[in-house]
Design a protein with these regions (language model features):
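Glycine-rich phosphate-binding loop
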Residues: 98-114
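Glycine-rich/acidic phosphate-handling loop/turn and adjacent ATP-lid/helix
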Residues: 68-102
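Conserved ATP-binding N-box helix of the HATPase_c
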Residues: 35-61
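ATP-lid-like helix-loop hinge signature
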Residues: 52-72, 77
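Flexible, glycine-/charge-rich segments associated with ATP-binding catalytic modules
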Residues: 1-14, 110-134
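Bergerat-fold GHKL ATPase/HATPase_c domain
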Residues: 1-43
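Solvent-exposed beta-strand sheet faces enriched in polar/charged residues
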Residues: 62-64, 79, 119, 131
Length: 134
């Protein structure tokens, strides 16, 4: 796997969620992602970036345009130093929410991408890495 370009984008306030969506849309377009796949990726970004702000107290989105077997993709890691997720199994259940949301953020995001990895612990923050291939 090779990495073409990468960077970090702050996700500290609600406005950063919009900017993260715009950045990822551009990255996906530049690597030739089909509109349907681009839309799925941007929707997942919206959910995860919003969770980073609302539940994680803000954090960062690390991004990379990558290639594997001549297939480009976008890999994103959302990380925060918030309270973490005490029960991952429960959090990954459709309809469950720790706040006022619909409870579709994590499970919805997972369904919209090709790869989804969640690393969290109470008091240690949360790190979610997603990848969408073209």
């Amino acid at each position: 796997m090779t990495q073409a370009s990468s960077g970090t984008h702050p996700v500290l306030i609600e406005q950063d969620v919009v900017l993260a969506r715009q950045l990822v849309r551009k990255l996906a377009q530049d690597c030739g992602m089909r509109l349907i796949d681009l839309t799925k990726l941007v929707t997942a970004v919206s959910e995860l970036a919003r969770n980073t702000v609302v539940y994680g107290g803000g954090g960062y989105m690390d991004w990379a345009v990558i290639e594997k077997d001549h297939r480009p993709g976008v890999r994103l890691t959302f990380r925060d130093e918030g309270p973490g997720i005490p029960d991952i199994k429960l959090a990954m259940t459709d309809g469950w929410t720790s706040g006022s949301g619909l409870g579709l953020g994590l499970t919805g995001a997972k369904r919209l991408v090709n790869e989804f990895e969640l690393d969290t612990a109470p008091g240690k923050g949360t790190r979610i890495t997603i990848t969408r291939w073209t």
